[in-house]
Amino acid sequence: MSLDLDWNLLDDQLSDRFLETINRALEASASKRPSFIGDIQFEKLDFGSDSPDVAIRSITDIWPDFVSIDEPPLRRRGARQTTPASNATTLVESPTDSFGVHHGGVGEIPLRTYTQFDDAAPPNRIHGPPSVVSASVAGSGPMTPAAAAGVANVFSQQWSTALASRGIRAAGMGSATSLPQTQVTSPVDSVPPSPGYFQHWQQHQQLATTGFVPYSVINSRQTSLDASSLRGGGSGPQSSVSQIGVKRDSNSLHPPLGGTYANGLGPRASMRATSAPSFRSISGQNSPGEEREAVASPSSASQLPSLQMRLSLVWPTTTFRLTITTSLLINYPSAAFMSLPLTLSVTGFMMRCGVIVALEGEHQRAHVCLVQEQDDERDPAFVSAGQAAAGSEKKLNSAGINILPQLTFESEVGQHEKHVLKNVGKVEKFIAEVIRKGLEDELVYPNYYTIDLPASKRHSL
């Protein structure tokens, strides 16, 4: 799928706003500027007539890093409109609680706990906080029938508490009577088990108590339903918890691990490659006030959707112009003893990258960042150009060079009325490194920009 861009909308007014934003960022980072570089000023920006080639690669749930967990969504601040969230990964946000020995001797858990269930792992292992059951269901050694039944009853009570707190009833579990919130002593107890683990436990529980496993339990994969749908009496949609294994196979859900971050050299060596989180209370249920707010309003149909698009961008241009003015300072025998005016003009570049646009409908905002293209998506000619820019045939480790391998400049050192040095190679190379480094530090994931969108009744993609 491709996008049609109206390149004429990039007018002088938008260019001026971009320049103001860039110059404010430069003023804020003036202390990081080298001592031999004077004040930097971006004076002119022209996007040119060469528009990029943009294509949609995937549309998925929002990455957890983009979700605004520090403030409630608009519907909780008074706007009566909701957007259902995915349950593929659960983000529990709750006050810090202390747990005793009956929770495995765990002291305190973080305010926010990310829990991911991995169906590819053995069914008796769960990746998450220690307060989630991670021991073998069958035990580490042989058990008598009575001991096996006792272990099954213990796990039955634990999972019954967790499922009942979410209003979920599973086959073979008995009644799903809601328990008081005081009985749900751990925030992570509201997290449903993964399908593989729950099915294994259910079969073992049936085997320990009755000596056989019902056929319906073996074939059942729908172990978790949305609490709101069960509350309404309908069967409800299948929870995305049972589809984690399918979603995890999609490369579009994972931040790229190539380049600097794959080697553990970036600011975030280990990134969470999960789907969007869902916000739930300790008990896993909405309060009565939130239930009333969750009623769909007439304007909810026109609300901005919550989704994430991955775009592929290829932008070769020779008409782009960006004028930069600064000065070279000579700090001997004293500071700023001599100053040489320096004017740089970017006259063209070659850019290829992935663009992540995450629309957060509940907060009316958009998150934008750049990512490196995957190895199988990159053009061999583009890779060779990046290798030439790096000066070696080795695998590139710099995201800035991968995204922006070619930059052309016109430079002038001095003043027109006096002596002028043109096209100074070392100065141009230094400025190119500064631009690539700035691009990597500002826009390349895990760095991103958040844009507050104006409230409107209708939005179109």
UniProtKB/Swiss-Prot annotation:
Protein name: Mitochondrial distribution and morphology protein 12
Protein's UniProt keywords contain Zinc-finger: no
Gene Ontology biological process terms from the UniProt entry: mitochondrial genome maintenance; mitochondrion-endoplasmic reticulum membrane tethering; phospholipid transport; protein insertion into mitochondrial outer membrane
Family, as annotated: Belongs to the MDM12 family.
Main location: mitochondrion
Molecular function terms, GO-annotated: lipid binding
Region ranges (Disordered): 75-104, 226-301
Keywords: Endoplasmic reticulum, Lipid transport, Lipid-binding, Membrane, Mitochondrion, Mitochondrion outer membrane, Transport
Gene that encodes the chain: MDM12
InterPro entries: Mdm12, MMM1_dom, SMP_LBD
Provenance organism: Mycosarcoma maydis
Topology in membrane: Peripheral membrane protein
